[in-house]
Amino acid sequence: MAGLVDFKNEEEVKEYLDNLGTEYSYQCFKEKQPDGCNRLAEYLENIKKNFESAAHILKINCDENEHSESCYKLGGYYVTGKGGLPVDLKAAYSCFLKSCNKGGKKSIDSCHNVGLLAHDGRVNDEKPDALKARDYYIKACDGNFAASCFNLSAIYLQGAQGIPKDMNMALHFSEKACNLGHVWGCANSSRMYKLGDGVTKNDEKAESFKNKARDLHKMQQERTPQI
């Protein structure tokens, strides 16, 4: 069929990829499409392996267009120092915050990352901000990001500055993390029910969560490639 690329033909593949780059460049620079700029950055990163140019496009698209996915990706570049950018957690935090507040495919991941960076204090002169971390973990947990739900359970399990210990809330978020497939969410829920740790003791629920933790752990091991 005319127009289809023979992906076994090296010359056709090269021409196809070059045309993609031209198309995305046109979308970004001529048509001023934020989505086109994001596609161009992905093309530069994944096809051309030109991380410096990808970082440049991501920065423009995040700073000028506040494109959620580009801000998320740029935040990751700042975390690792990729694409010639300096390792700069405050810049990463700003990128993730934009992405989280903007919404989009990676906004939930970005909200979780804002929570992480606020939680460990490295973007606030080594002063953890548990309240801000909680607020952004809640946003991510509401979007069914399991790790954020688990981190919320840990905050309420131990208490933090400005956040009193609350075993009912700890159990609530631990159970949600478990239901989203987080092994330790299941394990902690099981333990709390087994010991009656701040909640009504319930051996049946303890066993149920224990079995779920075991099943999830087994599934994870099966998915992990064996050497």
From Swiss-Prot:
Localized where?
Mitochondrion intermembrane space
Q: Got a GO cellular component term for this one? A: mitochondrial intermembrane space
Q: Where are the Sel1-like repeats?
A: 34-66, 68-104, 108-145, 146-182, 183-218
Q: Which domain of life, per UniProt?
A: Eukaryota
Q: Which UniProt keywords apply?
A: Mitochondrion, Repeat
Q: Does the keyword tRNA processing apply?
A: no
Name one matching Pfam family: Sel1
Function description:
May be required for assembly of mitochondrial respiratory chain complexes.
Family membership: Belongs to the hcp beta-lactamase family.
PANTHER family from the UniProt entry: CYTOCHROME C OXIDASE ASSEMBLY FACTOR 7 (PTHR13891:SF1)
Q: What is this protein called?
A: Cytochrome c oxidase assembly factor 7B
Whose protein is this, by species?
Xenopus laevis
Q: Which gene encodes it?
A: coa7-b
